[in-house]
Structures are given as C-alpha cells and as structure tokens.
Design a protein with these regions (language model features):
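Extracytoplasmic/periplasmic substrate-recognition and gating elements
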Residues: 256-263, 300-372
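Glycine-centered hinge/linker elements that transmit conformational signals in sensory
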Residues: 190-197, 237-269, 309-310, 314
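Extracytoplasmic "Venus flytrap"/periplasmic binding protein-like
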Residues: 66-139, 171-175, 281-282, 300-303
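Short, well-ordered beta-strand elements
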Residues: 36-48, 70-77, 103-104, 215
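Hinge/lid segment of periplasmic solute-binding proteins
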Residues: 105-161, 190-192, 205-209, 304-315, ...
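Extracytoplasmic/periplasmic solute-binding protein
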Residues: 147-155, 160, 187-241, 280
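Short, solvent-exposed loop/beta-turn-alpha elements that line the ligand-binding surface or hinge
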Residues: 125-136, 178-182, 207-208, 213-215, ...
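Conserved C-terminal helix/tail region of periplasmic/extracytoplasmic solute-binding proteins
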Residues: 384, 397-459
Length: 459
C-alpha cells in the first residue's frame, strides 16, 4: 500500500517539476523573443530643427503606430535640400569626418544619380505591393524610378504655380480692362505684360521709361522645356537641347519679345523679391515658395501697403497640351537589416495614408501624393484659415484635374544644362533689352538676333 502511495507521490512530484520546467522555458522564450524598439534616423527639409510640421507628425507616429509596432523615428537633421544633398553624398562616399548615412533622408533624384553606388539604397518595390502603388499619382512615382528601381518615394510634391498680386492687378484691370482670364495662356500673358509696362510707366508721368515688368519667372529653363514638350516636340535629343524646331521658336518669340520690351523681370534672385517690392505683380514659382510670399508690399520709397496674393495654375500655350513641371523631393531608404528596412517602410506607408498625408502637406504648402488624398483636399481647404493657402490648394486641385505632370529626364548633365541655360538666357536678353532702350535695332531684329546669339552660346 505504501509502495503504491509513494509511486503516486513520485508521479505527482514529477509532473509538478515538468510543469515548472516548461513554464520556465516558456518564460525564457518570451524574454528572448521580445525585441527592443527599432530606432531609425531621418534627415529632412520640412521646417526647422525645433519648429517642423514633420517633426510633429513623427512625434505622433512614435506615440501611436510606432509604439504599437516597436518603431521609433529620430530626427537627425533638418536643413535645406542642398545641404542634405551634400551631407548625403559625403556619407555615401564615406568621406573622412562624414556622418553615418541615416535610415531615411529627403532627396531629389539628382542626389541618387550623383552617388558612386546607388545600390546602398533599398528598392521600395520590395516593401510596397503593386496594388498599394496603384493609389499613387503615376508621374510622382515615375520621377523616383532609377534604372527600374523605386529609390525616391514621394511623400509631398510641389509644382509650378502662378502667383498674382491681386491688389495691384485689380487697379490695373480697372484702368485697362485687363482680365484675370488673360493669365491662362502664355500668349495673352505676354501681350498683357506690354500693356502693364505702359500702364505702370504712366503712373509717374514726370519720370520717363520707369515702367515695371509684369512677370517674373523663377525657372526660365522650365518655361522652355515644358513649353516645347507641351507642343508635342522633344526638348532634348539625348542630353542635348534641340533649338532648331518650330516649336522652340514658338516658345521663344513671345517670351523674348516681352523680355526685350520690359515685360519680364530678368534680374537674379527669387520671384518672391520683386513681388515683395512691387517691381512685378505676377510670378511663376515653386508652389512651396508660398511660405515666402508676403502679404505686404514695400516700395523703393519705403511706402508700404497690404496686398492679397492669389494662386492659379500656370499658363499654357493655346495650341498646346496642359503640361506642368512637377517638383519636390522624395524620401530615400538606406539598406541595412531587413527588419530596419521594413520598419522604415511602415513609417513611409503611415505618412502617405490619405488622411495623414493631407494633414502633412497642408501644413507645409505641398501637394499630396495619392488620388485619394487629392479627393480630400476640398474638405481640407474649408479648414484652412489663411486665404493665400486656400487659393493655393484650389490651384492644386485644378492643376491635378486638368494638367499632366511633366517629369524632367534623369541624366548626369541635366543640372549643368539648367544652370548654363538660366545664366545665358538672362544675360543675352538683358543685353538685347539695353539695345532696345538705346534704339539700336527694331524689336523683330532683336528677337531673332538674340535667339541666334543665345543658341550659339549653348553649344
């Protein structure tokens, strides 16, 4: 009997020991599988180090989705695109003293093209399904495709927008009958610039030839590039600009005429400056520059007055398509461990969810990147309190509905071509303007002589 009881006791003890061992093993397993949060670094351009809409969203992510997923985003640098371009290349090339490349950084494709080895970047195709990518504006994705790999992912885009000092334009309109609708085509805008020059000159009858330029364009290169392409002809042949087409001539003639007659601002600097001083009243600039358009004009004699700035889609040629340059950097993902890359991709997905993306872009003056997010803009506009921003986002909606976004070609010589074009065209037209003011030649001769001089200078 005792033997039986002892056997039962031994069995019970054995079971208890086994259960205890298994429980301990299970506890150890849990401890081993629990991971520390993955901390990812990012360099970006949206705001300042201490005052940034993206930093605020990153804090939100870290406290919600990131907390749930065990992901923490840490901001390493907030600067401008040029600085980040330089720092990324130093890090990528492992220059002495360079910082470590962050997990995520904001970049233009030109930065990737300038890398010695772009294989250090992850392909977003590995983390976004084709079904997920269908939600994005195709042209925005296309700009970030390099050699078949999606290396620069769109999170916020800008485009070119026409900004108008409506306050002064209304005075001009009241005196001349000019209409805001005349700003819809390049032909009408250039004609109107001649009228504006004469009108502004007449405001000070005691001072001769002090008319003002109506238009300032931040990107003369883009005007020609998009203009020629909108007329159905290639602007580039390989990496060379094609000048000897009728379409280039069509884009050149009204532009050069207006510039030589004084209707286009040709000085250096950004378009915001002549609008701030009243030297011009219409500008074509990046939509992101809305941050720098002031609601007050300060004239050269120190007089100032409040003004209303409105935004409109850029003009087009009457017989051309509605084409507009897309702008704005994207976000690059540095290769590391699969877990880190996947965590970074989750943050990018979160930031580009329609509601979140609209929240982000409307705080920085950019466009959203998906079709669904664009559909949310009308409601978002109603929540904006700044009339200038309301006007900008309505212009975004009109642009997205009516225009095709143009993606500049990805080639090593693109930036050099752009810089040389901008410098030479301002220089040649400024020279022609002086000759015109000195009555050295008639306008027709100057338009086409200057074309020849300019095209020769680009060889």
């Amino acid at each position: 009997m005792r033997s039986t009881e002892e056997k039962i006791k031994r069995k019970v003890i054995s079971v208890v020991i086994i259960v205890a061992i298994l429980s301990t093993m299970a506890g150890c397993g849990k401890s081993q599988s629990r991971k520390e949060p993955i901390t990812l670094t990012i360099w970006h351009v949206y705001g300042g180090q201490t005052d940034s809409p993206l930093n605020n969203l990153i804090d939100e992510f870290n406290g919600t989705e990131g907390k749930k997923e065990g992901i923490k985003i840490q901001v390493g640098m907030v600067s401008n695109t040029n600085t980040i371009h330089e720092e990324v290349l130093k890090a990528a090339n492992k220059d002495p003293g360079a910082a470590k490349l962050p997990d995520l950084f904001i970049s233009y494709p030109k930065t990737v093209l300038a890398m010695n080895d772009s294989d250090i970047l992850a392909d977003y195709h590995d983390y976004f399904s084709e079904n997920e990518l269908k939600d994005f504006i195709p042209e925005f994705l296309g700009e970030g495709e390099i050699d078949g790999r999606l290396l620069v992912f769109p999170v916020a885009k800008s485009t070119e927008i026409l900004f108008v000092n409506k306050t002064i334009f209304d005075r001009f309109s009241a005196d001349t009958g000019a209409s805001m609708e005349q700003l819809a085509t390049w032909e009408d805008l250039f004609d109107l610039s001649d009228t504006y020059y004469e009108w502004s000159d007449a405001q000070t009858p005691d001072v001769e030839d002090d008319g003002k330029s109506m238009l300032v364009h931040d990107y003369h290169f883009n005007y020609f590039q998009v203009g020629v392409e909108s007329l159905g002809t290639d602007f580039f042949n390989g990496d060379k600009i094609v000048y000897d087409t009728s379409e280039f001539g069509q884009v050149w003639e009204p532009y050069a005429r207006a510039a030589i007659e004084g209707g286009i601002w040709l000085n250096e600097g950004y378009a915001t400056e002549p609008l701030r001083t009243g030297e011009s009243i219409v500008s074509v600039a990046s939509s992101a520059s809305v941050l720098y358009y002031e609601d007050i004009v300060t004239y050269s004699d120190n007089r100032s007055e409040p003004i209303e700035i409105i935004a409109r889609p850029v003009p087009v040629f009457k017989n051309g398509g509605k084409l507009v340059m897309q702008r704005g950097a994207g976000i690059c993902l540095t290769k590391s461990e699969p877990e880190r890359e996947e965590a970074a991709a989750k943050f990018v997905k979160w930031l580009t969810e329609p509601e979140k993306n609209v929240q982000f872009v409307t705080s920085v003056g950019y466009m959203p990147v998906t079709e669904k997010a664009f559909k949310l803009l009308p409601e978002a506009i109603n929540n904006l309190t700044n009339e200038k921003y309301k006007s900008l986002y309505q212009a975004f909606i009109d642009t997205q509905n009516e225009y095709t976004f143009y993606c500049a070609p990805q080639m090593d010589s693109y930036l050099d071509s752009e810089m040389k074009f901008e410098k030479n065209i301002r220089m040649k037209l400024t020279s022609a303007r002086k000759r015109y003011m000195n009555n050295e030649a008639d306008i027709e001769t100057l338009v086409w002589d200057t074309f020849q001089e300019f095209s020769d200078s680009m060889e």
